[in-house]
Amino acid sequence: MVAASFETVAIGAHQSEDRGARDVKWRGGPMIEHMPVLFAAGLGQLPETLASGIVNGCIYALAAISLLVVYNVTGVINFAVGDFLMAGAMLTLLFAGPNGDPHRLPLALAVVLAVLIVTVVGALLEVLVIHPRRRYGTIFLLILTIGISSLLEGGALIPTGSLTYGLRPFTNGPAVSIAGVLLPRQDFWIVGSTLIVMGLLWYGATRTRTGKALRACEVNPTAARLVGIRVDRYWTIAFALGALLAAFAGAILVPVTYATYNMGIPITLKAFVAWILGGVESPVGAVAGGVGFGVLEAVVLGYSPASVANYGDAVPLLLLIVVLVVRRRGLTRRLVVTRV
């Protein structure tokens, strides 16, 4: 039944008029609809390239913040973040269906329900899988998150197969022209949502008891326990919040690309690079790193020959090597010494 539902989504998505004449092949990362092959087009397409990079970067930024939240509270690098994003995208597709299917849920409700389900799954995985094995150390837990990633990927493969799926934009209508640059309406949802999430995180961290308790667990877990904070509970909250952020990123991403069961690992890698670029403890840095990486990726792939662009997934690896070479002392000390 579920597989049949996804088949309907796939057929409808490829026939959608709202998605225009686009035929973007998923290559392991968000490929925004207005990113053409720019090698022959020259600098005339630079504004569109930068716009694509910023939109891509916002998705990477949300995933990077997810990594940051989990790491700051627990010391665990969650390599399942991309698959939480994939789950959010796939569940949104399943619940909403393409082109306003009257037999499916309204789009807004589909997004909320998908994000809530992934959030609960994230919390349950922490309680049932991560938490009982904390004493084995952070390296073991990191490897465990890779196993969770494989589990989520396999779980998505069973009902969806290896097909790609698409969703209509949140707001229908032609692209908006700003200073001569055509911007699809979904881009405004992505950028605006990222800014709103940043504002909500700042408010939550500085104005709510839960946020302050999370920060206390981050700064000094022992002292937090002494003042009555249940650190174990906030491990669960951190994983749930990380899953929520990733799932929301997947839900707002899927209208501008095609989703597939194996989209998670490349996004995890890119989010990890963005997180490292921005500093492992700074939410603002994670956003800056995500947007910066997105722009760099767009420029490199956009102005490269097709033979080079086909190896686009190597960009984050090369950038990570450069960052670790240039700032090797600061980054490694921060990642290792802080959590001993």
Regions found by a protein language model. Give the residues of each.
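Inter-helical junctions in multi-pass inner-membrane proteins, predominant
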Residues: 43-59, 183, 204-209, 236-275, ...
